[in-house]
Regions:
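Cell-envelope and extracellular/periplasmic
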Residues: 1-257
Length: 257
């Protein structure tokens, strides 16, 4: 009760830094260690996105502004059930955190996730160019791990983030470390670019189950290989019963896609 919460980006970032400082202080006092432990966070995403993506932006900005915070990246590529990661998703998430910790704290190499660094208008009035920090080239649209999201997860709006101001995107293409968006109409006035937002959906399933809001297909080419393999949560035994338990009304645990 009476715990502060917010969806405002600045306020959330301040609260995130506060809890980071409090946790580090507690650990240093409890274990008498001189150094602050690193604080690794993910980016809120998938079904938990809200409008202007203020929370995920606050998490990324905090990591970029504080030397002792590392953003490991989003978790939307990982399998979930109703927004909560399933066994495979949590295992994958754990490996992502382990990779980031090992690279940054054991190998001593800095880690920054794939992220935009600049957005600029092109000569053509219908085009926008988004420049990225790409940890491992090349930049890729991946439709293997996630079904193809409409426009690979990108959305463009004029003036404000309202459905009626959403622009029709004719083409999305990768150009080196950049993504170039070509819209149907000239982009005049304030332009808002959204990636993996609340209105994203599987391209061939705009109104179907598991539309995958908060998802996109853009990734880098990190060569890291997982230690563990995906487990079929719907595998059955010889007697026809499921290996992994479930409620009586559930016929499958795998994501619908």
């Amino acid at each position: 009760a009476n715990v502060p919460n917010t969806t405002d980006k600045r306020e959330y970032k301040k609260l995130l830094v506060n809890i980071k400082n409090n946790m580090q202080k507690d650990i240093q006092q409890q274990y008498s260690q001189p150094h602050k432990p690193v604080f690794i966070t993910y980016q809120t995403g998938a079904q938990y996105m809200r409008d202007t993506l203020s929370i995920s932006m606050a998490q990324l900005e905090a990591a970029n502004e504080c030397d002792d915070i590392i953003c490991a990246g989003p978790i939307y590529p990982m399998t979930d059930r109703g927004g909560h990661l399933d066994g495979n998703g949590y295992r994958w998430f754990g490996e992502m955190l382990g990779k980031v910790y090992y690279q940054s704290q054991v190998q001593g190499k800095p880690f920054r996730p794939l992220q935009p660094t600049a957005i600029a208008r092109e000569t053509l009035p219908t085009q926008i160019r988004i420049k990225y920090h790409v940890p491992v080239r090349p930049l890729v649209f991946d439709t293997y791990l996630i079904p193809k999201i409409k426009d690979y997860g990108f959305e463009v709006y004029l003036r404000d983030y309202r459905q009626e101001n959403k622009q029709i995107i004719k083409q999305v293409e990768i150009d080196g470390d950049d993504v170039v968006l070509t819209c149907e109409q000239p982009l005049v006035g304030d332009v808002i670019v959204v990636y993996a937002g609340t209105r994203s959906f599987i391209e061939d399933r705009p109104k179907g189950k598991d539309g995958l809001q908060g998802h996109g297909n853009l990734r880098d080419s990190d060569p890291y290989k997982a230690f563990f393999k995906y487990e079929d949560l719907d595998e059955v035994q010889k007697d026809g019963t499921f290996i992994h338990p479930r409620d009586s009304f559930e016929t499958r645990l795998r994501p619908d896609y």
